[in-house]
Design a protein with these regions (language model features):
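Glycine-rich, aromatic-lined ligand/substrate-binding cores of catalytic
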Residues: 218-371
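Substrate-recognition/cap regions that form aromatic- and gly/pro-loop-enriched pockets
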Residues: 318-456
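A contiguous strand-loop segment
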Residues: 19-117, 137-290
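Sec-dependent N-terminal signal peptides
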Residues: 3-13
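Sec/Tat signal peptide C-region and signal peptidase I cleavage site
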Residues: 14-18
């Protein structure tokens, strides 16, 4: 998503919306999958799970381009002769593309460019069979028709390779772009979170590094770089990290890496206060093979157990809420303060963990584990890459950003999560039980579902595709039904800041059939002490 940013010359930026991507190479994962993720974070954003069916198009067919963020019509381009099936951010060849916006130099934005970053993703998914082809398609499109967005980091993956590409325009009324794409080693993990991550790169490694021919020349022409080509540093030239870029953005990358290796040497960098602190590498080698379930947990991260944890300061409130309202920065009596910005955040519109597997037929190998809210507050459901119809709950007629529907996953999941946020430590355990039980059932069923799909595949790929489409849609609808039950359970269980007792999964009653006496837990001891410290004797009872 886009972030509002000030000039790179300012000491701090204002990050209003932001996203997070994690990447796992095939030899770094527990089962040989390439894995990548995307939290699409933006206040007020309402996005359906999109579907673009495969098509063959006559010469002269035109494709209309609408800005992905605003819906504004930008123009049209010739449609490809053939396009591939796309559902969400994965296509039928298991190519998956995500992004995070880092902004960079404002003077490099070209408002007249035809294609925005979001449109670029979905155009490319419809036209690419591999990650390398996707890089070629993306760069050709923006070089031909212009690029109107600010600096972007793209995750581009297929069943065999994972890449990071960073791109920026060349300024007003210029169709050109500068860009660098780097392949993540198969045994490594990487991440990006709204701060440019590419620094120096090996221009001689043609197999694993691809870049625009003028990536250095353009910087020289602007007076932004005058060293040797081999010394050229992408983000120090085009998007130098400031305090906000490090604390609000790079800290999320630090926390992800910290799950899989000791990141203590880089804590000064992530904290953002120490100038000249050693920056983090683009990738690390994890200390063990990483499972899909672990990556889902990383999408739910709030810096737990680190110096950046959100559940142990006064802003967590009485019930240890690891979420903070925005703006992230605020001012008190002329002094500026800030809140932490974790991976899991309330403004997530959708979240996915994509799984790409080279050893299976492509329509079976690609799975988008999808949720329509904050990853911490949803059960990810499987959407197979060849699916031809979205679940109704992820594409609900009549539901939108200002129209609630109890048939829509975004609204039902937000209904639940917004009950839980203010009383997190009390209510979240109830949500977690339901979430984890659903996901456990999906993972336990995956092998048998895919075994049956392989049997049907022998009868024809359409038979397997229809089977997986039906399975994905049924699973998503079952999740929605369970989440509606959870919503009504929570309002009964935790009504009026009290807790109703249960026995054997049922609310207890008295002998006369009335509801049993509720439990009133009050504040935690920690919060009581905070009240006493803040107010002194204001609420102290007199000693009799």
């Amino acid at each position: 998503m886009r972030k509002l940013f000030l000039s790179v010359m300012l000491a701090a930026s204002t990050y209003v919306s932001a996203c997070t991507n994690f990447i796992v190479g095939k030899d770094a994962s527990a089962d040989g999958s390439v894995i990548c993720t995307y939290n699409a974070d933006d206040y007020g954003m309402f996005i359906n799970l999109c579907h673009y069916p495969a098509s063959k198009n006559a010469p002269g067919t035109m494709r209309q381009i609408y800005d992905w963020d605003t819906g504004e019509y930008r123009g049209q381009i010739p449609e490809a002769a053939e396009t591939y099936n796309v559902i969400g951010n994965i296509n039928e060849y298991q190519v998956t593309i995500g992004e995070t916006t880092y902004g960079g130099r404002e003077e490099m934005i070209d408002p007249s460019g035809l294609i925005d970053y979001g449109s670029l993703i979905y155009l490319t998914l419809q036209r690419s069979k591999t990650a390398r082809e996707a890089i070629k398609v993306m760069t050709n499109l923006v070089e031909t028709y212009g690029y109107c967005s600010s600096g972007e980091t793209f995750t581009i993956c297929d069943p065999n390779e994972a890449w990071i590409m960073e791109m920026m325009g060349k300024g007003p009324n210029s169709k050109g772009v500068v860009w660098v794409a780097i392949r993540i080693p198969d045994n490594a993990i990487s991440a990006h979170a709204n701060q440019s991550r590419i620094t120096t790169f090996n221009m001689k490694d043609k197999k694993n590094v691809i870049y625009s021919k003028d990536v250095v020349k353009f910087a020289r022409s602007k007076g932004w770089f005058n060293g040797k080509d081999s010394e050229f540093n992408w983000n120090m030239t085009y998007a130098e990290p400031d305090f906000g870029g490090r604390r609000f953005c790079e800290a999320r990358v630090w926390s992800f890496f910290n799950h899989f290796t000791d990141m203590t040497p880089y804590i000064d960098y992530a904290e953002g206060r120490v100038k000249g602190a050693k920056p983090m590498p683009l990738w690390i080698i994890p200390d063990h093979k990483v499972s899909l379930q672990e990556i889902e947990e990383c999408m739910r991260d709030h810096y737990e157990g680190t110096p950046f944890a959100l559940d142990n300061d006064i802003a967590a409130g009485p019930w240890d809420m690891p979420y903070r309202p925005t703006p992230l920065s605020f001012e008190v009596d002329g002094k500026k303060y800030f809140n932490e910005r974790p991976t899991s955040t309330q403004q997530t519109a959708f979240s996915y963990v994509a799984q790409m597997r080279s050893w299976l037929p492509r329509q079976i190998g690609g799975v988008l584990w999808f949720g329509n809210d904050d990853g911490n507050m949803v059960a990810y459901t499987p959407i197979y890459c060849g699916n031809t119809v979205q679940p109704e709950c992820y594409n609900t007629p009549g539901a939108d950003a200002v129209t609630f529907s109890d048939k829509n996953a975004y609204w039902v999941c937000n209904w639940v999560s917004n009950m839980v946020y203010p009383r997190y430590s009390q209510m979240f355990p109830s949500l977690k039980v339901v979430r984890d039980s659903l996901e456990k059932s999906y993972f336990e069923s995956q092998a048998s579902i895919e075994k049956r799909a392989l049997e049907l595949y022998l009868q024809g790929d359409d038979v397997a595709i229809n089977y997986l489409t039906d399975y994905s849609n049924e699973t998503a609808q079952q999740m929605l039904a369970r989440w509606r039950q959870l919503a009504t359970y929570l309002i009964v269980k935790y009504n009026d800041m009290a807790i109703k007792p249960e026995k054997d999964g049922k609310f207890e009653r008295t002998e006369t059939g009335q509801g049993a006496r509720v439990h009133r837990p009050g504040y935690s001891d920690t919060f009581k002490r905070q009240i006493a410290k803040f107010h002194g004797d204001r609420f102290a009872e007199p000693v009799e």
